[in-house]
Amino acid sequence: MHRVVSLFAIVTCVAGIVSSAVAAPPEIRLWPQGMPEPVIPAAPPEKVEKSADGIQRRTNVSQPRLFVYEPPAGVKRTGAAVIVVPGGGFGVLADEHEGSDAAEWLAKNGIVGFQLAHRAPTNKHPSPNAGPAQDLQKAVIEVRRHAAEFKVDPQQVGILGFSAGGQVTLVAATNDRKFQSEEIAESHKPDFLLLLYAYQIYDPKTKGLRADILLDGGLPPTFIAQMGDDRGSLPQGSTLLYLELINRNIPAEIHIYEKGGHGFGMRSRPGATGPTDWQLRAIDWLRLRGYATAP
């Protein structure tokens, strides 16, 4: 009996180790030779915690990197890639329901998902989005550098930004490259964008978009989803962004739902259709452009 139990324990242990190894996605470090300022100290160490509200939060990120989620066996690759930028108010990264869950969802639809872990916290910096925007620009470059490895078309690299990640996405995409640390041939400009309740992109004082979103620099085709009752990211920002895009003849689509609040990511909300419906609309939008597999 003892021998059977011991054997069972060994098999279970080995299976757990193998399962854990398989579950861990590959990583791409963004700044192996050192990142530009502002630098996040290595201490305290990086921490990932899930609290009582069921939200996983990552913080103390001193080594920005990408986690790679490839389409599973049997799913046809489209050649597209999407970098997922979680929200978290620049203090933490909500990197499960606004990160890995989204990357896995994209992978199931034939898209290689790259989850960004940008430097954090930066919420006490003079410009909280500056470091994360550098990381995102470098992430786009690194995805193009690794295009052959992950069977990605370097001209089909998009970004999906949630909340603060949406703000970072717009700043990174509309500004010139924010670092000069090395010779770079690849462009940091994405080929398409998906924005979910982008955080504080509306300036109530000017009744316009925030000053560091430079739309005259150009944006690619953009999908926007927003909840009308969102008090964390006001719907005026998403609406104004959409109007600015169509006034510039940039292909854009927007979905505004009555209810759903803020920060739902890939999760449903009781009594609200928006938090799940946007996923269907986004996949339709991606399919029309050949970025996602047919149903």
Where do the model's predicted regions map?
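Primarily recognizes the serine-hydrolase "nucleophile elbow" in alpha/beta-hydrolase
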Residues: 134-217
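Conserved alpha/beta-hydrolase "acid-adjacent" motif
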Residues: 231-240
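N-terminal cap/lid segment of alpha/beta-hydrolase-fold proteins
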Residues: 24-77
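C-terminal catalytic histidine-bearing segment of alpha/beta-hydrolase fold enzymes
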Residues: 239-242, 246-295
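Short beta-strand/loop motif that positions the catalytic acidic residue
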Residues: 218, 223-226
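Short amphipathic alpha-helix adjacent to the substrate-entry channel of hydrolases
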Residues: 95-114
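Catalytic nucleophile-loop/oxyanion-hole region of alpha/beta-hydrolase
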Residues: 94-95, 101, 118-151, 267-275
